Curated annotation (Swiss-Prot):
Keywords: Membrane, Transmembrane, Transmembrane helix
Record-annotated membrane-spanning stretches: 32-52, 56-76, 87-107
Additional observations: Partially overlaps YOL036W.
Record's subcellular location: Membrane
Key word Repeat present: no
Organism annotation: Saccharomyces cerevisiae (strain ATCC 204508 / S288c) (Baker's yeast)
UniProt name for this protein: Putative uncharacterized protein YOL037C
Superkingdom field: Eukaryota
Amino acid sequence: MSKLSRKSILDEDEDVEEILPKTRGDERSTWVSSSSFVSSSLIFCKCVVTVVELDVGVALLGIVGRVVPLYTVTLLEPEFLNLGGELSWCSMTNFCELFFYFFSFFFSKKRPNIDSK
């Protein structure tokens, strides 16, 4: 009799094991597919953000490499600032020149000639 009861308990356990893995498998496959979609979209967003950061970083390096030396040269000119510390008209023209060089750097393939004065 103990063998019979043991067998019936084992049969019940097998039935439970047959039902549970299917349920767990379905839930798990849904979870895996949704998590893989989320992770792939996050990876895509991270790649886009990284590319944008690289573009902005390269652009900033280009600006710093081109504009800062020119700006320091114009700061060393004696007529750039008046004695009150306010910007003079000459400094505004130098400021406009900075923007001209900045835009010509991005819209032309060769470097603008800074020493043309």
